[in-house]
Amino acid sequence: MGLTKNHDDSKKTQIISESLDLLEWPTVCSHLSTFALTQQGRKKCESFDLPRNLSLSQELLSQTLEIGSLDSSLNEGISFDGVHDLENILLICSKGGIAIGEDLLKVADTLRAARKLRKLIFDQVIRPRLSELLKDVATLPDLQKLLEFGLDEGGRIADRASPKLSELRRYRNSVRLQRKDILQDIIRKYGGLLQDNIISERYGRPVLAFKAGTSDQIKGMVHDSSASGNTIYVEPQVVISIGNRLAKIDSEISDEERRLLADWSKEVGLNAIVIAHLVEILLQIEFALSRARYSKWLNGVPAILDQEEHSLFEIKDFRHPLLVWNDFHEKKNTVVPTSFDVAPDLKVVAITGPNTGGKTVALKSIGLAVLMAKAGLLLPCTGSPRLPWCKNVFADIGDEQSLQQNLSTFSGHILRISRILDAIDVFPGTTLVLLDEVGAGTDPTEGTALAMALLQVMANRARLTIATTHFGQLKALKYSDSRFENASVSFDSETIQPTFHLQWGIPGRSNAIEISKRLGLDEQVIISAQKFINPERVDNVNQVIQGLEKQRERQQSAAEDAAALLAKTELLHEELLNSWQKQRQQSEEFNE
């Protein structure tokens, strides 16, 4: 029984990650990660959890805006130089292990960088949200100074770390110099017996290269010979005792170095919790900075998120972030903005239009807009976008899972939609549902019936459902239920090309035959297809829709003309006002 329940729960939660994948949210996060400054920052951007409530989303947005403003005001921006990933180092030290000098220096560098960042960012008036994060962060200056005093660049333990270490190293250098002088004397004395005048090393011992057959001329220990046998490497007897003395000194130095590393590691271990908290706060700040820089790159604007479920969706000229990314890297400018204007009482929008017209892009755009706002990112659009905070975003786009499971397209859609319906029950809250080609993949009559029934169910259970479709009957739902609305991807009848613009309140025209003709389908097939349809009925519908489109264009053009006229009027008013004030001031000065 328990196993069955867990399996059912897993199926219901599966749709959450599946929907994110279908909307290509992981790719957006991957793009976000390129604006991070550290490896751990990049990992955070790629795998963060979306906020579970509105206040957390608002917190993230405030952090994004605060650090973005600061970053833009600095010539070289905010730097995270010196910040390191300390997770493994802290684990070693907290368990009583001994960290190497290089790792301990990373701790010191991170503490120094943290104090510098805290000083730069902390301002409870200008940056209250970030300051709240940093308020209780301890940067442990005494520990930083201890480690920096004892360690040189690269993590080498400095001579100054302890008097004993300094004395031992000086003594070792003195003995090494003594041994070198003795070996140089031997080279001068026995130069004729040597292959060269170089002091070499074998197995940690100093040796001289004697010619074969001459090594018995001097007492010593043979450590090696050349491959040809022509050279014998001998450590002269006179320096063997010195070498033994150096080995003992090296051992004492190693013991002292190990003692120092152990002491410092212990100090780090005692402060591991404090340091881990500091590193986590730095990661949150870097995450905020990454969001700010990505948002700036997108020319984004902050969205207003509403707690009220029945608030409007108002997003103007949204540019799909992945298309913006592709355009930038391909040096193009082809992204067509999409606008959404969904009234509070609307529950279902049916988008119709040609396959090549960008219906799926529009579907993904609103899904990504909701996710980006939820994650504290600015939206790549204009104006002041406003939308409800959505707890759930569920999507059925494409049939990737169907292919993986060897299911038909229709079966794949139905299974995913079933998971969406189950998830709405399990995860109550404001929900956005996105359905691509709803009811497709089966008999059109039954598919239409299923699509209509499904959208009516969604109207009762989700805040907003947006569905793309080819079924003409779905366009009629708005006339029997005020919660439904139509939208379409506009189509240029002159060029027989989709414009990729989303039009609200106008259903899409049937352009299948025109598109097929443009794509080069055999002319006889086109002629035969035209005979199978009722031309009068189709022409009437298309003429009505075309008339609506032209009326919309005229209204939009008139609105643009009115806006331009208003702008000119306001400018003229401002100029007249300035002129009047200037004349008045001159008159007052003259009277004085």
Task: Give, region by region, the residue ranges found by the protein language model.
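Extended, charged coiled-coil "arm/hinge" scaffolds of SMC/Rad50-like chromosome-maintenance ATPases
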Residues: 139-155, 241-262
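Conserved amphipathic alpha-helical "coupling/scaffold" segments
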Residues: 2-164, 168-171, 271-274, 278-292, ...
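Extended, Lys/Glu-rich alpha-helical coiled-coil stalks
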Residues: 72-80, 104, 258, 265-269, ...
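Charged, amphipathic alpha-helical linker segments immediately N-terminal to NTP-binding catalytic cores
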Residues: 281, 287-325
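Terminal-proximal interaction/regulatory segments of ATP-powered molecular machines
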Residues: 559-592
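Active-site phosphate-binding and catalytic loops of NTP-dependent enzymes
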Residues: 43, 94-100, 122-129, 182-197, ...
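ATPase nucleotide-binding head domains, primarily ABC-like/P-loop NTPase cores
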Residues: 308-552, 557
